[in-house]
Amino acid sequence: QTFFHPDKYKHYVKFWGFKGPLACWICIWGMIAMLTSAPFDDWWHNTYGLDVQIVSPPHIVLALGIFAIFLGSLQLVLAERNLAQESQKKIYDYLYLYAASLILLQFCIILTEYSFVNKQHSLEFYKLSTIFYGFVIIAFSEAARTKYAATIIASLYMIHRLLILWILPLFEAEPLLGPIYREITHYVAPEFPLLLIIPAIIIDIVRSRFTLSSKILKAIIFAIIFTLIFLLTQWYFSEFLLSEYARNWVFGSDRNKPFWVPVGDFNFEYWDYDWTPYGHKIPMSPVTVKNMALTLVYSIFSIYLALLFSGWLKRVKK
């Protein structure tokens, strides 16, 4: 763009004497963060031992870098879309939705340890899910020009996870790092994806039928829909995933246990405790009306921030 489209210079951002799209600067920052995370992670291993959880300081730096690259790519697509002719806008709309689904997927990966199906009757799971997934789905679907954008974003996330769930176990693999508590002969796939598509569909229907001009009112309505619908669907669906009916190639509940997890009845039961990396028990909070009411407040605040963020995305032209 810099060399072949000099007429677009007026849309570029100047930084340290260079000119380029703002999205490129965001991607460069993400690249620097990812490169920094590698020696940081190596030092972390040498100091504290091997990884025992996904959420660690070097992994957060890496995740922020990946997020910046996704966000930069998405922003570049948006900027091109906002400047494109009407006949060219459709392809940019679909590229935008795909990039948004990758961001949703990244959040799901980061929250893996809080989203095990055995934890899906705990307050912690629903609190984090409504805060982060609600933010991503609302923020990027609001900025989209496509009808049923939230549904498309959630669908692309589910398709990606389902393909991983079904394809990974086709390849042979064996663990080489102890402790090994179970026989593993193939790659272990992640758990069945969360049913984020259900609240996404309801939100899209409400958005298409009602015009809500107030951001506060919209945040309240979307938060109530997302929190209640997600709670109801995932609560009972998790019970199915723990049952013997989900132990097949479609749902993969009998093939998603890693080698370091001992074999036992607790593999298919809800957990009352979580564990620290040092082996200490942490009691998990129950889902009560009072706790979910507070979670709803968090969700309203998160979705309100998502609406503000989507407003900025709509104006991106650089």
What are these regions (language model features)?
Residues Q1-T2, I60-V77, L128-R145, E191-R207, ...:
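Hydrophobic cores of alpha-helical transmembrane segments in multi-pass inner/ER membrane proteins
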Residues T2-L22, T47, G72-Y94, A139-I153, ...:
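Juxtamembrane membrane-water interface segments of multi-pass membrane proteins
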Residues F40-I60, I109-T130, L165-H186, L242-N256, ...:
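Membrane-interface interhelical loops and short amphipathic "cap" helices
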Residues G134-I202:
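Long, well-ordered mid-to-C-terminal structural blocks that present hydrophobic/aromatic surfaces
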Residues I180-P193, L212-W235, Y245-L307, G311:
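C-terminal transmembrane helix-loop-helix hairpin of multi-pass membrane proteins
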